[in-house]
A protein has these predicted regions:
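Active-site-proximal cap/loop segments of hydrolase catalytic domains
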Residues: 1-181
Length: 181
């Protein structure tokens, strides 16, 4: 699904899915999943959003908003705690895209997109795989660890939450420790 926020359809399309408009991204994905299920192309048990980096917001929030709609989720080097993201090494450059916690409107937008802050007790979440490179300079690996721990703590069904950390990788594409140093 080409959800709003991507660059596929130009700048207006991109702006329709950034900052306070970020909820459009996961609402578009949810609408696409509902359409495919309603038309009989698939069932929820076969649907699995996958997103990496900022796409972790898309995957994480689609599942925290509609866990019943998906059989699994994959979050790769995902930005999953948008509230704390600004405090990380790469946080300030992301303010233009996501907003800032230093003003009320920005904080509300970041809270809306923060998957970690929408994980609730008693909800049956689908199976989850979170992957992260330990040397990631863009999205700190603690985000995936924190999200995995939260899902494991609240998810009482038999669906597993798995975390894979690659100690020789960064933000994808082979950022080894040697390359970072």
């Amino acid at each position: 699904a080409h959800v709003r926020g991507g660059g596929e359809y130009g700048q207006a399309w991109h702006y329709a899915g950034r900052m306070q408009n970020k909820p459009n991204t996961w609402k578009d994905l949810i609408a696409a999943a509902e359409y495919l299920i309603d038309k009989g192309y698939t069932g929820s048990e076969h649907m699995a959003p996958m997103g990496g980096s900022a796409g972790g917001i898309l995957a994480g929030r689609s599942v925290t908003e509609r866990p019943d709609l998906f059989g699994a989720v994959v979050m790769q080097v995902g930005m999953l705690d948008a509230i704390r993201a600004e405090t990380t090494t790469n946080g300030v450059p992301n303010i233009k895209e996501f907003g800032t916690v230093t003003d009320a409107k920005g904080f509300e937008g970041l809270l809306a997109m923060s998957a970690y802050h929408h994980v609730e007790e008693g909800v049956q979440y689908p199976a989850a795989l979170l992957t992260h490179g330990f040397n990631d300079p863009r999205v700190n690996p603690w985000m995936s660890g924190k999200m995995a721990a939260r899902l494991q703590a609240v998810n009482k069904n038999k669906a597993p939450t798995l975390l894979r950390v690659d100690f020789d990788a960064g933000h994808g594409i082979g950022s080894t420790r040697e390359q970072v140093l």
